[in-house]
């Protein structure tokens, strides 16, 4: 789940003066964004959830344009819970391209903010979440988002870690070891059959393990 509320407890275990970080399971990015914004740390974020990656890429590319798309979506569909299944299917079945990247990122944001615990494609809709989390204040925060030392790309943990030297600091927040979990990805696709043993093998090859 999200780490925003646990941020202070987590970062006390991080090195001081952290200049570079690799995050192979970016997700919501609370820890990574904190370091990119507050400490100017160079953060290399990766995730296999392609629609999530597209969202972050569009936020970093042009937050004002993305906000405009979100506003259009909210104006056209004032209550996403009424078209929930249709909206999720659109994200599942539409390939991201140059012409639709911002529109899909806006739809991802709307669904994420309107779903139980931000589960997006792995959870149901929540009218309460829609009212409290998909509102003017949240859209304004999106518009003002800045993190120039952050990048987010689509790659699995093995590929992403291989792109960086073994001594670069890694913050790894992998899927929980829950065989029946459906909390992340598309209906739990990021949880199902995740190879924790392979992750262990890859991580132990790095320096200072």
Regions found by a protein language model. Name each.
Residues 56, 109, 209:
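A residue-level signal for conserved active-site and pocket-lining positions in enzyme catalytic cores
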């Amino acid at each position: 789940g999200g780490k925003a509320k646990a941020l202070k407890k987590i970062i006390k275990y991080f090195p001081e003066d952290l200049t570079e970080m690799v995050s192979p399971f970016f997700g919501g990015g609370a820890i990574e964004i904190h370091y990119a914004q507050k400490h100017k740390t160079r953060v290399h974020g990766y995730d296999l959830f392609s629609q999530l990656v597209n969202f972050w890429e569009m936020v970093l590319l042009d937050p004002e344009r993305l906000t405009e798309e979100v506003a259009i979506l909210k104006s056209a569909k004032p209550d996403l819970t009424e078209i929930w299944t249709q909206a999720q299917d659109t994200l599942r079945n539409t390939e991201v391209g140059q012409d639709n990247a911002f529109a899909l990122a806006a739809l991802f944001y709307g669904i994420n903010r309107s779903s139980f615990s931000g589960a997006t494609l792995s959870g149901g809709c929540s009218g309460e979440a829609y009212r409290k989390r998909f509102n003017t204040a949240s859209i304004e925060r999106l518009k003002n988002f800045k993190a120039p030392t952050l990048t987010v790309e689509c790659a699995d943990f093995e590929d992403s870690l291989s792109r960086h030297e073994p001594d670069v600091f890694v913050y790894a927040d992998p899927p929980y070891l829950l065989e029946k979990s459906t909390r992340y990805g598309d209906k739990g696709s990021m949880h199902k059959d995740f190879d924790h043993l392979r992750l262990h093998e890859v991580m132990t090859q790095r320096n200072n393990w």
